[in-house]
Amino acid sequence: MICPQMATPAFPHDHRAFSERTLLVDNVEQPYFQQLMWAGMIVNAYLPSTVFPTGLSADGLPIGLQAVSAPFRDYRCIEFARLITEEMGGFVSPSQYP
């Protein structure tokens, strides 16, 4: 299964206290912690997942998705993510971070 890693592409680092961090999602400011739901649903089900790059946002920051596999199929999940990353052109470093 392929699903979001987070509700937004990569974002600039925020060094404020965790409880003070926010992100814009569809132009609505939301607590950063809410974004962990995407990863949390998978982790709480004890399913293996592997995040892979899919390109860069309009801001030039990485966009990623997560591949999710059946229980105890970690290697299959990793291999799938490797293959799809290869098909999509591999990881591209953002120009602001060469």
Predicted regions and their residues:
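Serine-dependent amide/ester hydrolase catalytic core
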Residues: 1-44, 95-97
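Structural helix-boundary/capping segments
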Residues: 31, 43-98
